[in-house]
From Swiss-Prot:
Gene3D superfamilies: 2.170.220.10, HUPs, Isoleucyl-tRNA Synthetase, Domain 1, Nucleic acid-binding proteins. One of its GO terms (molecular function) is ATP binding. GO terms for biological process: methionyl-tRNA aminoacylation. This is Methionine--tRNA ligase. The keyword S-adenosyl-L-methionine does not apply. One of its GO terms (cellular component) is cytoplasm. Its main location: cytoplasm. Belongs to the class-I aminoacyl-tRNA synthetase family. MetG type 2B subfamily. It comes from Listeria monocytogenes serovar 1/2a (strain ATCC BAA-679 / EGD-e). It comes from the Bacteria. Residues 563-664 form the tRNA-binding domain. Keywords: Aminoacyl-tRNA synthetase, ATP-binding, Cytoplasm, Ligase, Nucleotide-binding, Protein biosynthesis, RNA-binding, tRNA-binding. Its EC number is 6.1.1.10. It is found in: Cytoplasm.
Amino acid sequence: MPEEKNTFYITTPIYYPSGKAHIGHAYTTVAGDAMARYKRLKGYDVFYLTGTDEHGQKIQAKAKERGISEQEYVDEIAEGFQELWKKLEISNTDFIRTTQDRHKTSVEKIFEQLLEQGDIYLGEYEGWYSVSDEEYFTETQLEEVYKDENGKVIGGKAPSGNEVELVKEESYFFRMSKYADRLVEYYNSHPEFILPESRKNEMINNFIKPGLEDLAVSRTTFDWGIKVPGNPKHVVYVWIDALSNYITALGYNTDNDTKFQKYWPADVQIVGKEIVRFHTIYWPIMLMALDLPLPKMVFGHGWILMKDGKMSKSKGNVVDPYMLIDRYGLDALRYYLLREVPFGSDGLFTPEDFVDRVNFDLANDLGNLLNRTVAMINKYFDGEIPAYQGNVTEFDQILVDFKNNVVKEYEGSMDHMQFSVALNQLWSLISRTNKYIDETAPWALAKDEDKRTELASVMTHLAENLRIIAVLLQPFLTRTPGEIFLQLGLQEENLKKWDSIYGYGEIPAGTTVVKKGTPIFPRLDAEVEVTYIQDEMKGSAPAPAEEVAEVEALETPQIGIEDFDKIDLRVAEVKQVDKVKKADKLLCFQLDLGEGKLRQVLSGIAEFYQPEELIGKKVIVVSNLKPVKLRGLMSEGMILSGEKDGKLSVIEASSALPNGAKVK
């Protein structure tokens, strides 16, 4: 018999299909996916649930506006959510819909049980009702009230800003107050039940201490929902209908409840902060009434906001996840969502930050590390990773110790749902590995045959760190880890598993890297892409930059010899090269053109060369180019480079040519 795995059950809220899925839905679901993938990586039997809440007055009204049935409407919207999950490569185990028979049958049984127990009773309700929120409010809860000339309240706005109307109807009620003390006791004995901690204080102080009122759990003002057993003029309201999905999806109250017995209670339920109250008051009280164990944790995350507040079409600030994936790749979006915003807090989406994350974190830090490593293994060892030897250079053990510490910190952060912290720790390992290249200077070691052992050690440490980085990236990015494994020539599945990160030097000697690595994240033109995203948010994006560039390439004009003669090409010797602060593409050259003084030229090749590699080379310079200022530095010329597959290579002149020789 195979050893039984530890289980892990994680859920997102079921989304209300009143419109197109947006980046907020993507954020919650990608976060859940990262946690599910992390636990699978560690060997857990994971059940990841998401879905749609498909009943209610608002949906009934939307379907009527469209002239279609409610079922046709929710089928269409639910399909849109499932398409987005596929696009995001969400690894959910199941997708529950509240219109499915498996859900409806179980909900009917739950309602009957609570009614028979006396936890639900029939009464009458009068209050201020918001159709948009599908919730009743007392007069004191209203954000704004409207009064007539006699001072009588005649309307108002809910805390959400939506209009309310006075509604009186017969309703079934749930005796919430019966369980209030027991719930607070549970909070106190289970400190991790509500996270972050601030959410728990909010629930106690704002909702429980003032006194829990009995909760209306049925409606008669609309009929698109699950009929109350024995009283079909009532439909079961969202508090029982939607919240119970977390157990109905597992087969609760059915003849086949194997999954329920195996996975319940949930380990983590991820929800947006606006619905924490429903999941930490209504939901646990319902479970107490059913005599079922409560979830181990409800994590209320913040919102992704824009500079001008929440996303809305009227503000022209809606971010379409499909657009970001199609233009920049899935991993760029997944990385940004989980790195930019501390999970549990609100965060801002800006096009500038998104492009910077792609360029600096993904293309520069991670992409360049892979490119340089593969290129050096090809150059110095004919593409074969040498046998591992530990502690050869003075920096080797420092790097290994740093890795061990990062793994420990990363694991702690992931266990506490701190995704941005875990990614920050992982990027510190990427930065430390890049620093290791600068410290060991493999291009210098390669010039000394006596340093061959040290050079081999550097290559194995770089490859091994990249392997471990790829393993740790697997919860977050779905495609990049596989590309790193591919470029490093790693085929053994054991090298991609979680347990492999605790050791070191696991890559077999002679493993062959790819001959020519391709950039896993091409750099973006920041100005062009920021403008593109802004225009897309407003609904008026220009043609993609790639298409424009392709047309321009086909229409390059021909020139006469008289035009070419205007260009003064000279041989120059590189005397000094420095990186330019806050400009990761630029290098600042001091060149000898035989003029009796050095000339300063800036070139955008920093991602392809270390400064030390270029000193002493003879290069070709356009010497009569009009001087320009870049990043506050004057550039007096242009160094010629060739381009292939997105990589630039400096065109070198013969060492026999004197400095300043004219190139014809």
